[in-house]
């Protein structure tokens, strides 16, 4: 007798071992038809999996996130099947599920073209319509390697030969195609109805640039066509909002080959940067932080003491001078500990909050660089809090409150919070970790925040809170962190004199709100589609004269507004007013102030708000009041 416990708590009993598919059929024909897999005692399995023991089981359908993953994984195999049918000389490698889709890497003697992708996608549709059953068989490592060698698939054979000999190998087949995979997969190809191939990119075998270059075909797959259409529309919107495109269009910044991963900020881009930095500086000053500045280059000995030289050196830029090795700092923490150590600290001095807009450099692989989102040189809104064990919860509460307020001011209302908990390999005792993790939970609870816990995802030196902001397109970006560190103060000898005159290690909290300023600006640009809020806009207004006779008034008006704190410029070019309006509209300036003879004579302005909204003619003072109202609504 086999007892199966279902998600609703009910128990079904069977006289003999049953498959997941048979359990689904015993519940109802609709569920049997919809079943894509099962979750057997928490493990995702195929519908053909035999259950021969008492267990809990949830039937997975296309309404479940796991079901969508199964569909995407199976569609990756369908892609490989189609490629092998159309291009028999192509060799298959790997094809995992990724966010919103999948990819598969191939070795082939020529690049795949857009026309090839169309042919492949069409063949995938034909194969899916055949509704061929997907079967699984388990074989030995040697049998699997021998099979793939015999059909000329050297990459698959190499993968298998790297697996321990004692491990069982699963092979999945449908039609004339067999692939190595852990599974699970859909019961038949007819379940794969909504998919699209997206693009081809280069990749290296096993991710190593020393190996052969492969071709990676990306695709997306969904349970419903409406979901795919929505996703494709989001991609179109994302392309329009691409910060690299808008950076050029709005004349904010550029990057060039002579300085990979570094940003050349143009005047308008730097004005935007300054607004963000000055805002952040004001907020941390109000929160009781002390701003410091630490050296960009420090001796190897400090990085050895901190552990970075041993564990992070490949990501560091190093140099040598007078037979001494130095590193350009990849992070600010060791420097902040040096400031803390300079002089004897008392418990009365704590908490000490050091903030720095620190310039850091990391030797990222050139292939990983991506506009402002992934750079080699960046500035962090970094800060470190040195406090006692009794203070770290209240400091965490204060930081949570500050971070949530900052995100809201920048226009981000949806924040996902994740709490990374102790890994298997870690410093400190279980009791210390218990206090640290519970303290961070208590701080989040005190702020009325909800969070997801990630067991095993914490750093070896302490638990961490991550703050993921969602942009206008629903994309998630991890920006802020609050990291408790149980190791660095000890490594670098940080201590304070406690109330009983003993020497103790401070609790160290690493924290950032926006993280990399460059990356955050890229996120901001895409979130607002380049149309920055008035308080952030590089230019809040542009004064436009219609003819030469109003140039002097336009110039004096711009100067007057500038003295009142408005970021403004005058466009006095001898161009048609329609041309100037169109140009500055494309630059997404919040307000265009048009002056003709009537406005000059009456000392007024014709105001156009962003989006082509005509606000009519008004006194200059009325416009300034409107602008101030915009800024007050932000503050």
Curated annotation (Swiss-Prot):
The protein's Enzyme Commission number: 6.1.1.3
Entry GO CC: cytosol
GO molecular function, one term: tRNA binding
Main location: cytoplasm
Primary enzyme class: ligase
Record-linked InterPro entries: aa-tRNA-synt_IIb, aa-tRNA-synth_II, aa-tRNA-synth_II/BPL/LPL, Anticodon-bd, Anticodon-bd_dom_sf, Beta-grasp_dom_sf, TGS, TGS-like
Cofactor note: Binds 1 zinc ion per subunit.
Gene Ontology biological-process entries: threonyl-tRNA aminoacylation
Region called Catalytic, residue ranges: 242-533
Short name of one Pfam family: tRNA-synt_2b
Residues in TGS domain copies: 1-61
Keyword Signal: no
Keywords: Aminoacyl-tRNA synthetase, ATP-binding, Cytoplasm, Ligase, Metal-binding, Nucleotide-binding, Protein biosynthesis, RNA-binding, tRNA-binding, Zinc
Binding site for Zn(2+): 333, 384, 510
Cofactor entry: Zn(2+)
Catalytic activity as recorded in UniProt: tRNA(Thr) + L-threonine + ATP = L-threonyl-tRNA(Thr) + AMP + diphosphate + H(+)
PANTHER family documented for this protein: THREONINE--TRNA LIGASE, CHLOROPLASTIC_MITOCHONDRIAL 2 (PTHR11451:SF44), THREONINE-TRNA LIGASE (PTHR11451)
Function text: Catalyzes the attachment of threonine to tRNA(Thr) in a two-step reaction: L-threonine is first activated by ATP to form Thr-AMP and then transferred to the acceptor end of tRNA(Thr). Also edits incorrectly charged L-seryl-tRNA(Thr).
Assembly description: Homodimer.
Similarity-based family: Belongs to the class-II aminoacyl-tRNA synthetase family.
NCBIfam families in alphabetical order: thrS (TIGR00418)
Name used for this protein in its record: Threonine--tRNA ligase
Record organism: Burkholderia cenocepacia (strain ATCC BAA-245 / DSM 16553 / LMG 16656 / NCTC 13227 / J2315 / CF5610) (Burkholderia cepacia (strain J2315))
